[in-house]
């Protein structure tokens, strides 16, 4: 698929593990390689072709607005403001806003450092149709995956030969890749999202979606980093130094 022009950033989390190193600073504004964390996420989405961006902030995230507007040149940026109860509720809220405008869209967590080249490839491959063996249809959703694992609680994923996700979490057997905080969803799939209280975590939604038999594509990316802890920042900065090198 080419030309994904809509995306969302989930930037409403508390960032509790980063707080000890950056007290009083909202997670999206934590500096990484001299720029706010949210800058790198927005820049990679822009490189993927995104021109319309929805950003979810919590009630303490107002300072993020001006920082993001400076980093999102060429994109129309709109904000949602909500103190959500879970990562699932946040994803659902952003997805439903996007589904009213776009046939397919990307969603990223604010802590996902993904090289621009990988973001472009994810946008291109996340909606590509399967061959005749797969019925010639496109996936309902897609997950960005990486083999770089440096997370306390990684969500493992198993793929078949066609790139379809066959198992997540405890259902994964081979455990050769993990999710990285970058997602794609069709408007049709977004219209069928369960209620905000159905899941306590975003990963629970994805596990259930794969178990239901829905066509979910896994797109293998290079080295990506989730910035959850102060000790993740050096790894993220090493990845950033290689952006489009």
Predicted features along the sequence, with ranges:
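Short catalytic helix/loop segments, enriched in acidic residues and glycine
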Residues: 24-39
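N-terminal nucleotide-binding beta1-loop-alpha1 segment
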Residues: 1-23
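A conserved acidic beta->alpha catalytic loop
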Residues: 57-62
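Conserved beta-loop-beta/alpha segment of the NTase-like Rossmann-fold superfamily
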Residues: 64-66, 72-159
């Amino acid at each position: 698929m080419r030309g994904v022009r809509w995306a969302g950033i989930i930037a409403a989390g508390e960032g509790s593990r980063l707080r000890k190193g950056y007290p009083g600073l909202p997670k999206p504004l934590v500096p990484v390689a001299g720029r706010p964390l949210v800058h790198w996420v927005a820049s990679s989405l822009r490189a993927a072709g995104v021109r319309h961006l929805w950003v979810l902030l919590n009630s303490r995230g107002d300072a993020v607005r001006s920082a993001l507007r400076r980093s999102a040149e060429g994109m129309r940026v709109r904000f949602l403001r909500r103190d959500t109860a879970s990562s699932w509720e946040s994803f659902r809220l952003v997805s439903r806003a996007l589904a009213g405008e776009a046939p397919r869209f990307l969603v990223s967590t604010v802590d996902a450092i993904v090289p621009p080249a990988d973001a472009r490839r994810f946008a291109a491959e996340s909606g590509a149709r399967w061959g005749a063996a797969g019925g010639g249809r496109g996936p309902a959703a897609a997950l960005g995956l990486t083999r770089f694992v440096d997370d306390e609680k990684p969500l493992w994923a198993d793929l078949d030969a066609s790139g379809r996700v066959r198992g997540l979490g405890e259902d994964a057997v081979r455990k050769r890749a993990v999710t990285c905080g970058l997602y794609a969803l069709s408007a049709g799939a977004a219209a069928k999202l369960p209620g905000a209280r159905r899941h306590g975590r975003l990963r629970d939604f994805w596990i259930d979606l794969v178990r239901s038999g829905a066509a979910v594509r896994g797109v293998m990316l290079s080295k990506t980093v989730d910035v959850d802890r102060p000790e993740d920042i050096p790894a993220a900065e090493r990845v950033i130094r290689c952006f489009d090198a």
